[in-house]
Amino acid sequence: MIKIAFSPIYYHELPVGHRFPMLKYELIPEQLLHEGTISLDNLFVPKKCDKMDILRTHDVAYYEKLVNRQLSPSEQRKIGFPQSPELIERELVITQGTIDCALFALEHGCALNIAGGTHHAFAERGEGFCLLNDMAIAANYLLHRNLAKKILVIDLDVHQGNGTAKLMEKESRVFTF
């Protein structure tokens, strides 16, 4: 059975007129359930990601600024979201969802995170609506625990996952396509 990471926290209220389509995180599971593509048994709610798992990928200074909501106005503009405790919690849950999906995929072949794919986050900064790079964090999680020998990240976004590519450029066991 395919497992899909989803949490109500994936939807985060944004200012009126904000261009990010946050509503999709509610609509996707609703539609999949409505059409019978999945059942509630397919969905699981991740917990928050552990700090140490994040720090294998992100700089401690950036992480501390992020979780303490001390990003500068310029850093917030690059990310595209206003700082809030709920947004940080959302990112921690999304990231753990991707780790959980990677573990489930190793055992069962496939898993999905409805809100994963935050590929524009770099070690020392976020950008493009990405605060933490969940894919790089999950890859480092698997490698650190010797759960994978090689990892392929398939990124089909028109903008390319620049953060993931940069974070993994010196890691020969990870290839970003």
Question: Over which residues does each language-model region extend?
Answer:
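HDAC/HDAC-like amidohydrolase catalytic core signature
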Residues: 1-154, 159-176
